[in-house]
From Swiss-Prot:
GO MF entries: 4 iron, 4 sulfur cluster binding; ATP binding; metal ion binding; nitrogenase activity
Pfam families: Fer4_NifH (PF00142)
Binding residues for [4Fe-4S] cluster: C101, C135
GO biological process: nitrogen fixation
Protein name listed in UniProt: Nitrogenase iron protein 1
Gene source species: Paenibacillus durus (Paenibacillus azotofixans)
Residues carrying ADP-ribosylarginine: R104
Disulfide bridge positions per record: none
EC number: 1.18.6.1
CDD domains per the UniProt record, alphabetical: NifH
NCBIfam families: nifH (TIGR01287)
PTM comment: The reversible ADP-ribosylation of Arg-104 inactivates the nitrogenase reductase and regulates nitrogenase activity.
Length: 292
């Protein structure tokens, strides 16, 4: 009986750098730590595997199934591509905008992969999931007990933290009946004030850890323009070492918790305490001063 792979998922609001962070981290898990990895992209943008495959968007399960007639007509080799570090890549895809539910594509894809034995022999299955909305579809890797460990990519910006708290709420809902747990917050820095302290404090309140603080560096964008991870583009760069540290922490992470999401009032007060947003009194005083 082969060991079961660890099923992890990266969630985070759109534009936070979730796919970039996950691919850079997984590249290190594969190359430095010798882990066998499959990425299952669950974002309708289908960009969860671009930096591993060094290509534009990969053909998706839903698109290929539609071309052939149904998922039953697909073969595993039609949808699985091998990229940097031997990482296997699949994009579930999504429907045309305004039609249907993207979550259905995720469900269809994961069921197909499991039935075809795609997960056999893997150390990690990684789901890359849009996280602004934890609707039924996007919550599917959590809800169906597929993903066991959730990592939330966030920053010190208000909307990123708001999304992180919402995702924690979604995890809590399913953690009580299933085995899904929160593995930690990954701070993908936007260089906002006191960001490290702020996310550490948010993590504490959510009953988790800030597993790593990823500093902002232009080399990430330079690598992205070439459709590469930093590890492939410039393995000696200090930023590659940041992703190596994060990969190591995930590999050895034993702090898997049931989160304690906070109320909106508490989140807003936290942002005021750290100076991210002003309280009304300060804002009014500033406006009055500007008016004189």
């Amino acid at each position: 009986m082969s060991k079961k792979p660890r099923q992890i998922a990266f969630y985070g609001k759109g534009g936070i750098g979730k796919s970039t962070t996950s691919q850079n981290t997984l590249a290190q898990l594969a190359t430095t730590f010798g882990q066998k990895i499959m990425i299952v992209g669950c974002d309708p943008k289908a960009d969860s595997t671009r930096l591993i495959l060094n290509t534009k968007a990969q053909q998706t399960v839903l698109h290929l199934a539609a071309e052939l007639g149904s998922v039953e007509d697909l073969e595993l080799e039609d949808v699985v591509a091998t990229g940097f570090g031997g990482i296997l890549c699949v994009e579930s895809g999504g429907p045309e905008p305004g039609v249907g539910c993207a979550g259905r594509g995720i469900i269809t894809s994961i069921n197909f992969l499991e039935e075809q034995g795609a997960y056999d022999g893997m150390d990690f299955i990684s789901y890359d999931v849009l996280g602004d909305v934890v609707c039924g579809g996007f919550a599917m890797p959590i809800r169906e007990n597929k993903a066991q460990e959730i990592y939330i990519v966030c920053s010190g910006e208000m909307m990123a933290m708001y999304a992180a708290n919402n995702i924690a709420r979604g995890i809590l809902k399913y953690a009580q009946s299933g085995s899904v747990r929160l593995g930690g917050l990954i701070c993908n820095s936007r260089k906002t004030d006191r960001e490290d302290e702020l996310i550490t404090e948010l993590a504490r309140r959510l009953n988790t850890q800030m597993i790593h603080f990823v500093p902002r560096d232009n080399v990430v964008q330079h690598a992205e323009l070439r459709r590469m991870t930093v590890t492939q583009y410039n393995p000696e760069h200090p930023q590659a070492n940041e992703y190596k540290q994060l990969a190591d922490k995930i590999l050895h992470n034993e702090k898997l918790t049931i989160p304690t999401p906070i109320e909106m009032d508490e989140l807003e007060q936290l942002l005021i305490d750290f100076g991210v947003v002003e309280d009304e009194e300060t804002a009014i005083k500033k406006l009055e001063a500007a008016g004189h």
